[in-house]
Amino acid sequence: MSEKTSTIAAAPRSIGFMPLWRREWQVKQQGAVQWLYPLVLFLVIITLFPLAVGSEPELLQRLGVSAVWIAALLSLVMGVDGLFKPALDNGTLAQLVVAKASLPLWVLIRLVIHWIFSSGIVAILSLLAVPLFQLSWFEAGILMASIVTGSPMLLMLSAVASSLTLSLKNGAVLVPLIALPMQLPVLIFATGAVDLFATGLNGLPILALLLAGSILSVLVMPWVIAVTLKMSWLN
């Protein structure tokens, strides 16, 4: 029996939300090394940045928000490569397609869990900007809020780029090239919101805009990703 035939034969009859969630949560916990690498990269960047630019408080405060956000973006892009490639290689995607499971639901669950283990933790670690960049706790709180509201949209854009390059031999190299131009506006708006609050102005409209964009991307992008994943499996 061929590998593809055995994969089809092993396909489950029905897959609901909770079985998918439990399975993806267990897979994420078992691959701790993979999701720890981006977090280590984030910590390395925000730790070494103050050493590189000097200890002048005003300079650190001016560059701190941008440095944390760039580190968050790089760590997010770094962890996207393993989102769908293993599922395609080990037959999980084939099982889901053959079982007529909801691919958009699976994609959404996978991305939500990935966000919890990546940007969710990064948002908490961003509070290290208080001692490292001489930010106030208020500014650090706004920075964390901007990461929470903006990072889901960044993740969805990276996931779309990853799914588009899934069938390519060196597709991981193309993911940042495709995703970063779309992610730069999010980065600009997020850092701008923190700067507005720091100067005493109201940055809530920008945070609301980031949140609206993230909600819209969460509602739409899983369907787009599901279509591209199915095309990659058929090819």
Identify the meaning behind each predicted range.
Residues 64-80:
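Long, hydrophobic alpha-helical segments
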Residues 28, 77-97:
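Transmembrane helix boundary and interhelical loop/hinge segments in multi-pass membrane proteins
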Residues 161-201, 205-215, 219:
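Transmembrane helix segments
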Residues 31-54, 69-73, 178-189, 214-221:
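Hydrophobic alpha-helical transmembrane segments of multi-pass membrane transport/permease proteins
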Residues 2-7, 218-235:
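Junction motif at the cytosolic side of a transmembrane helix
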Residues 108-133, 153, 157, 191:
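Hydrophobic alpha-helical transmembrane segments that constitute the membrane-spanning cores
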Residues 141, 146-180, 230-235:
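A structural motif at transmembrane helix-loop-helix junctions in multipass membrane proteins
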Residues 2-38:
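Aromatic- and glycine-rich beta-strand/loop motifs that create alpha-glucan
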